[in-house]
């Protein structure tokens, strides 16, 4: 089969008898033997058995875990072609499928840094690591920790299988060093530090989170399933001694069935309880539970574009919807009269207020609650109709009542930041349905090189302007 194009979810595609087949890890121009692994009414899913003639654009992957990890599906695609594919993805979602008329489709803003760009990585300990095909027979029947223990990423679609990661080109290089040190330290005494059994909910070592900032600060969070004080203290002391540059060394005792720590107490072992990121002279406190865009450099570019689209002069009332920890709200506050941020997570709103105080920003207000319950007509009448609305919703997009509230508020400009162009197109169509708004420009931003994910910013302007 000849692979003809890149497609959704990081797949490539070919056609068999007018039916589309999605094939992961293929490149346009590849001629390959493909096995059908799933057949639906309108499409098929396949996998490469062998590549008979590689595409001239195909390049060698930079990571030994490529095709198994699932994290960077486009390592074999040159970056400039990745960018073109993401541009096309946005155009298809908005214009071809969403029927949204956009006056100016601006070119994608690529990332200067295409490796080691993530500021946050989370790893899972497992006593049943994923065995590669060449390992299966070699270790058959050997269930020793040396063979079966792993610390790394979940295999896609398999919650209880973890790929033992020896190198990762996403996070800062120090993340590799810390992860490998902790792994080897625990492996010296596996009875004292048993890796977690995800299916049977047993073990001690559960997850590991490492966060970094562009200013060089470093946070390490070790999550244990139970509290073995002596084992915990010995491990954390060893980590602190080996990596004195750690700004914040934290731990969590999580006895729940799931790995989320949002409802768990985060305890300080050494250093500060937070790290600080900096953006255009502003400081942002980041705790273990705080949300912050995982590509710091591109986050600045994304927010800069959003602020530029907002066209602020200093007199505007701005609503920042889905404000998170108030990064956008605080970022634009210096060019607005007042900014009101709304967010579902109460802890995030506390972070937003803290960040305003940290930077001496006095013209922000933050409210916590479900967006559709907070952003009502009464709220708008009480706080004033915004001149500009900036919205950055989750992948699912905005609730229809939120769209209705925005239309009631009738701002002069709406800046829509999205990590999902498909739901963005749906919401834009609703905002533009009665002709009150027109889509003036759209600009994609690549936050995640070597993946299919893309952010997009769209400016809507009220037609009376």
From Swiss-Prot:
GO molecular function terms listed in the Swiss-Prot or TrEMBL record: 4 iron, 4 sulfur cluster binding; metal ion binding; rRNA (uridine-C5-)-methyltransferase activity
UniProt similarity note: Belongs to the class I-like SAM-binding methyltransferase superfamily. RNA M5U methyltransferase family.
Transmembrane segments: none
Gene Ontology biological-process annotations: rRNA base methylation
Annotated active site: 419 (nucleophile)
CDD domains referenced in this protein's UniProt entry, alphabetically: AdoMet_MTases (cd02440)
Protein name (Swiss-Prot/TrEMBL): Uncharacterized RNA methyltransferase PG_1095
Residues annotated as binding [4Fe-4S] cluster: 63, 69, 72, 168
Source organism phylogeny: Bacteria, Pseudomonadati, Bacteroidota, Bacteroidia, Bacteroidales
């Amino acid at each position: 089969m000849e692979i003809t194009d890149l497609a959704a979810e990081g797949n490539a595609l070919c056609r068999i008898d007018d039916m589309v087949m999605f094939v992961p890890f293929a490149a346009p121009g590849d001629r390959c033997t493909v096995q059908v692994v799933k057949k639906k009414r309108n499409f098929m899913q396949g996998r490469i058995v062998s590549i008979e003639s590689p595409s001239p654009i195909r390049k060698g992957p930079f990571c030994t875990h490529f095709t198994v990890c699932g994290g960077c599906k486009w390592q074999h695609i040159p970056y400039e072609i990745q960018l073109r594919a993401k541009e096309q993805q946005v155009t298809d979602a908005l214009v071809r499928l969403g029927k949204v008329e956009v006056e100016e489709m601006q070119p994608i803003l690529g990332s200067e840094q295409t490796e080691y760009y993530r500021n946050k990585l989370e790893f899972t300990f497992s006593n049943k690591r994923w065995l590669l095909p060449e390992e299966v027979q070699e270790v058959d029947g050997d269930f020793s920790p040396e063979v079966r223990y792993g610390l790394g990423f979940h295999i896609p679609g398999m919650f209880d299988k973890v790929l033992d990661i020896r190198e990762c080109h996403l996070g800062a290089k120090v993340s590799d060093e810390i992860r490998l040190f902790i792994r080897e330290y625990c492996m010296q005494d596996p009875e004292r530090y048993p890796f977690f059994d995800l299916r049977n909910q047993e073990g001690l070592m559960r997850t590991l989170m490492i966060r970094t900032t562009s200013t060089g600060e470093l946070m390490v969070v070790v999550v244990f399933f139970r509290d073995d004080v002596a084992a915990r203290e010995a491990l954390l002391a060893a980590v602190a001694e080996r990596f004195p540059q750690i700004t914040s060394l934290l731990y969590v005792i999580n006895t729940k069935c799931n790995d989320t720590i949002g409802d768990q107490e985060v305890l300080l072992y050494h250093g500060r309880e937070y790290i600080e990121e900096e953006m255009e002279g502003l400081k942002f406190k980041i705790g273990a539970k705080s949300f912050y865009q995982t590509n710091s450099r591109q986050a600045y570019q994304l927010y800069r574009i959003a602020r530029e689209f907002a066209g602020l002069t200093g007199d505007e009332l701005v609503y920042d919807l889905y404000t998170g920890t108030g990064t956008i709200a605080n970022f634009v506050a210096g060019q607005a009269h007042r900014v009101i941020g709304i967010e579902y997570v109460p802890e995030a709103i506390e972070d937003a207020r803290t960040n305003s105080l940290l930077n001496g920003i006095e013209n922000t207000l933050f409210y916590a609650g479900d967006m559709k319950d907070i952003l009502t007509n009464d709220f708008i009448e009480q706080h004033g109709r915004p001149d500009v609305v900036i919205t950055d919703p989750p992948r699912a997009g905005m609730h229809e009542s939120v769209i209705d509230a925005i239309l009631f508020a009738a701002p002069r400009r709406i800046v829509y930041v999205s990590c999902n162009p498909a739901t963005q197109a749906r919401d834009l169509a609703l905002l533009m349905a009665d002709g009150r708004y027109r889509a003036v420009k759209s600009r994609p931003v690549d936050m995640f090189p070597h993946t299919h994910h893309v952010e997009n910013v769209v400016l809507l302007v009220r037609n009376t302007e």
